[in-house]
């Protein structure tokens, strides 16, 4: 029996051609739309910070006119000179660095140790202790009792008032404990068979395997410690050498609000009278303060980004 070839008619051939074209055009349109959308999103996200940088490098008297977008009209360093004119700003910077590093390291180590302990099913008091820590997330004694507690602990006007209260975090403990729950139990059991104790298991197995979530927690703790100024205002305001960078910048910003009308206040903030009257305004000072306070965290974030993205997915995938 002879083979018969069936050739498509003109109508079906045209339909096939249209489908092929549509299959080629649709991905191009989709990618083009996504690219345009992401470019717009990046511009919307980055422009406020870029504009803040522009304002910080522009003369304050000119900034009041408005219309600053991508480049300063009257470029000046005067805003940053006003920020760094105070001799206390450098000491405050190192206090903030020391506070941030110590708070982050101690919080990570102690909170992870607590999370590992409360993740062990054989621990008898696991549930009541977990409940106690969760309650601290909802109930706070308040500012005045907190101050008297710090006073009774002899932490007022000491560096450790920045570190000790932040050594344990209930929320971070819950996040880390959730991550520890994804680590195979067989690893712990094998280590115990080999004679390893709980602390050795924690240091050699659990802690290294928690790097992704610890990087995420480290970023949260570090940003919180770096940006904090209210505790310096409450607990160490009478001891200038313990002032933090954020507290000094906050005082400078507050002083600049009255700089034009009260040059004496400007001089107290490290600004000359000429700068206070013409080159520096509260808006330009605020922009410079924002940049100075943000740069250290922006420099650290790229190195943490890989672990940060992984850590955000903790608990989102159930194996």
PLM regions: where:
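A hydrophobic, multi-pass inner-membrane permease signature
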Residues: 2-319
């Amino acid at each position: 029996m002879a083979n018969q070839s069936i050739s498509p008619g003109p109508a079906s051939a045209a339909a096939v051609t249209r489908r092929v074209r549509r299959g080629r055009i649709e991905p191009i349109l989709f990618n083009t739309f996504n690219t345009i959308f992401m470019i717009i999103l990046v511009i919307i996200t980055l422009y406020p910070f870029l504009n803040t940088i522009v304002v910080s490098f522009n003369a304050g008297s000119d900034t009041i006119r408005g219309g600053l977008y991508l480049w300063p009209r009257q470029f000046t360093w005067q805003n940053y000179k006003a920020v760094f004119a105070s001799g206390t700003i450098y000491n405050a910077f190192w206090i903030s660095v020391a506070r941030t590093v110590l708070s982050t390291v101690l919080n990570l180590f102690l909170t992870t140790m607590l999370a590992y302990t409360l993740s062990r099913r054989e621990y008898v008091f696991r549930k009541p202790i977990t409940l106690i820590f969760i309650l601290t997330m909802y109930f706070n004694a308040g500012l005045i009792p907190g101050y008297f507690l710090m006073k009774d602990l002899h932490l007022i006007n000491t560096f450790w008032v920045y570190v000790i209260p932040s050594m344990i975090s209930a929320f971070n403990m819950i996040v880390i404990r959730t991550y520890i729950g994804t680590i195979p139990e067989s690893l712990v059991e094998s280590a115990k068979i080999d004679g390893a104790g709980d602390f050795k298991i924690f240091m050699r197995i659990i802690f290294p395997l928690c790097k992704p979530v610890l990087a995420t927690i480290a970023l949260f703790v570090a940003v919180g410690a770096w940006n904090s100024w209210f505790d310096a205002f409450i607990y160490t305001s009478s001891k200038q050498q313990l002032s933090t960078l954020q507290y000094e910048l906050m005082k400078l910003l507050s002083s600049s609000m009255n700089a034009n009308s009260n040059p004496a206040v400007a001089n107290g903030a490290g600004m000359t009278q000429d700068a206070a009257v013409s080159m520096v305004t509260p808006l330009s000072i605020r922009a410079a303060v924002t940049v100075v306070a943000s740069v250290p965290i922006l420099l650290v974030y790229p190195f943490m980004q890989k672990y940060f993205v992984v850590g955000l997915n903790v608990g989102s995938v159930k194996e």
